[in-house]
Amino acid sequence: VYKRQLIQKHLPNEADKVSTTVSPMVACGRYVKSEYPEAVTVFIGPCIAKKGEARKFSDAIDYVLTFEELACMMAGAEIDPATLASESYINQASGFGISFPLLKGVQGALNHTLEELEETQVQAHYASGLEACLDDMKKLASGKLPCQYFEGMACVNGCIDGPGALAESGLVSVLIKKYASESQHKTVHGDTTAVKAVKKVDMEVR
């Protein structure tokens, strides 16, 4: 949402080139609402921009908490996660989906999807940090940056480095890569729930 606003403000002539697909948060929220109409959806992550996005897409997300806010709530309620019994969880997401918040995470999923579909690879470019994103987008608009697909992340080290994070991004990156490698789905389309959701849910910004 905010990257779209950034382009509309600084490069209005390029605004029509921005993807019209909603974020994973909104897509997931819409899918949950379609399956369970009475569900209350809560997004928990390191990103404070998601709060504004949730207001815009109230059809999908009811509440947003950062990891820091969740930790404060648990501390206030005197809940220590380390003392709670653990439960097994079967991860249904693909390794590529899990890797979305990492540097070039979306680009990796895109490239693998093109390989799966036996399509021609695109010339991609990546930038992180709003200043770097804007600089490179200006180069792209002026024809100085050859690129067919541009992935930009507002936070310097990707989503894992959001202001509401509690752990150092380098450590989080290692843990996410390990978690992704353990996924039973090694291809993008292996995540059958996600494939079903894409076909069922409106993925367009509206």
What does each model-identified segment do?
Residues 3-206:
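Iron-sulfur-associated redox domains of electron-transfer enzymes in respiratory
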